[in-house]
């Protein structure tokens, strides 16, 4: 059986929990047909991912793509069994992507939380950053708050969607606007560094008013359809989620958080022969999950 993705995922989640010591851990996956809404806006959305798998590959040579897909489906199903044993909440909502689920939960819990930390390498989450929401990039090992986003991009989080509408996103196969890079944006659109939301209407109005100032403004108008399309694709603050799905998310989040089930986790662990990855399972379970389990108990 192929469990490489499971071990990597559990190790990563465990390290994150130990490092940040949260009172609650929520994990979101893309739901079935999660990309459908964005593909209806742009048919080639994520087309570059057609043959990529969602869980990390194990060191295994598959004879066919079908064999690999079977292995990935097994890994995901098995991962769910492991997560069922841990004091975490996990969701995969049909018809929406993980980004949308996380954005909705962050919005719902914004006022009742001291701090929300989103763990992801996805820059789309920078648009959510404010005084309560921060984003941890595990690859860069860097925490993004409002100041960090401003320092790195010279763009305020409130205007991050518009900025990325110019630059695009190769990982999602979203094309940027050729000839308008970060430096050009900073020079001609300094308004994006302010906390005031700069809208598509503001952009269009300024470009029409400044055609004689620079060719950049004509280029913006020539590519406005692309910018507008990208804005719709990359905006996760709009919360274009069906009411029924929102209700389901709220229902799942309102349920008691499961308690740590050591016995079942250990059974799965030994069945999958994962001791080479975690040398001392009892210590890993105690040091990683016990405090989170104590918080979970308060929800019962």
PLM regions with names:
Residues 156-159, 167-243, 262-266, 270-285, ...:
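Accessory alpha-helical DNA-binding modules that contact the DNA backbone or grooves
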Residues 1-119, 125-143, 235-254:
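Noncatalytic, basic helical substrate-engagement surface that gates or grips nucleic-acid strands
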Residues 123-124, 183:
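Acidic, divalent-metal-coordinating active-site segment for phosphoryl/phosphodiester hydrolysis
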Residues 143-153:
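Short, charged, surface-exposed secondary-structure boundary motifs
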Residues 162:
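Conserved active-site carboxylates
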Residues 253-263:
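C-terminal/domain-terminus segments
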Residues 299-300:
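Long, compositionally biased intrinsically disordered regions
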Residues 70-77, 154, 224-227:
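Alpha-helix N-cap/helix-start motif at coil-to-helix transitions, marked by capping-box chemistry
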């Amino acid at each position: 059986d192929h469990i490489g993705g499971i071990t990597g995922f559990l190790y990563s989640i465990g390290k994150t929990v130990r490092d940040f010591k949260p009172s609650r851990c929520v994990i979101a996956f893309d739901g079935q047909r999660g990309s459908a809404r964005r593909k209806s806006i742009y048919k080639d959305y994520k087309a570059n991912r057609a043959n990529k798998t969602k869980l990390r590959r194990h060191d295994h040579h598959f004879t066919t793509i079908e064999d690999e897909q079977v292995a990935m489906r097994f890994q995901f199903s098995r991962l769910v069994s492991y997560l069922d044993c841990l004091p975490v909440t996990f969701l995969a909502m049909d018809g929406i992507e993980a980004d949308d689920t996380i954005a909705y939960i962050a919005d719902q819990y914004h006022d009742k939380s001291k701090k929300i930390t989103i763990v992801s390498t996805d820059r789309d989450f920078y648009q959510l950053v404010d005084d309560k929401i921060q984003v941890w990039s595990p690859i860069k090992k860097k925490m993004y708050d409002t100041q960090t986003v401003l320092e790195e991009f010279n763009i305020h989080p409130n205007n991050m969607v518009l900025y990325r509408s110019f630059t695009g996103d190769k990982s999602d196969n979203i094309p940027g606007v050729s000839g308008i890079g970060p430096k050009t944006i900073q020079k001609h659109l300094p308004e994006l560094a302010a906390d005031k939301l700069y809208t598509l209407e503001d952009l269009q109005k300024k470009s029409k008013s400044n055609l004689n100032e620079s060719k950049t403004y004509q280029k913006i108008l020539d590519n406005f359809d692309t910018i507008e399309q990208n804005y719709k694709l990359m905006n996760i603050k709009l919360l274009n989620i069906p009411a029924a799905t929102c209700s389901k998310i709220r229902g799942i989040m309102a349920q008691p958080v499961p308690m740590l089930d050591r016995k079942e986790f250990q059974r799965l662990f030994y069945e999958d022969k994962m001791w080479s990855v975690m040398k001392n399972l009892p210590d890993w379970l105690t040091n990683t999950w016990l405090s989170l389990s104590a918080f979970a108990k308060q929800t019962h």
